[in-house]
Regions:
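Extended, low-hydrophobicity, polar/charged segments
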Residues: 1-156
Length: 156
């Protein structure tokens, strides 16, 4: 909800369609993520050795970055965090997918750092998190030009 409000502030005006679509995305997405977790457990992915899990992790992250590139270009309905990177990219960062993605990660990174200093522990920070933080923007930018290249961004 906080990111949805931040998106509206960055737009400089209230965009009802965008606000509602951000909220509508969250609920089914949460259930999908939970279902995928159960599905991976059913396939016994967590029981695999490190190398196959790393390969699956990287392939999954490549797929997610390409998918975000596609649906950002469609710009129909977006997860609030993806919409944030989209707004930052085209309103403030001259179209740079890399810088926009890094900038959109400042909020969760701040929460991670504050939590670490408060507890002395890092939780749920693994290879996939670090890989996404470093490379997702670059993969999205590459996907913009190589995955359905005729699909263009509709900046509003």
């Amino acid at each position: 909800m906080v990111v949805t409000i931040l998106n509206q502030l960055l737009l400089g005006h209230f965009d009802r369609r965008r606000f509602i679509s951000n909220l509508l995305y969250i609920v089914p997405f949460s259930y999908l993520v939970q279902f995928i977790g159960y599905f991976w457990d059913w396939l016994q992915i967590p029981a695999l050795s490190l190398l196959p899990r790393l390969i699956l992790n990287v392939l999954g992250l490549l797929g997610v970055a390409a998918a975000v590139s596609i649906y950002q270009r469609c710009n129909l309905i977006q997860h609030p965090n993806d919409d944030l990177s989209y707004i930052l990219r085209f309103r403030f960062l001259h179209g740079s997918a890399i810088i926009a993605q890094w900038t959109s990660y400042l909020q969760p990174l701040t929460i991670i750092v504050v939590s670490f200093f408060a507890t002395g522990h890092l939780r749920a920070i693994g290879f996939g998190t670090v890989f996404a933080l470093i490379a997702q923007g670059a993969i999205m930018g590459w996907s913009d030009h190589h995955v359905f290249p005729n699909l263009k961004h509709h900046v509003d």
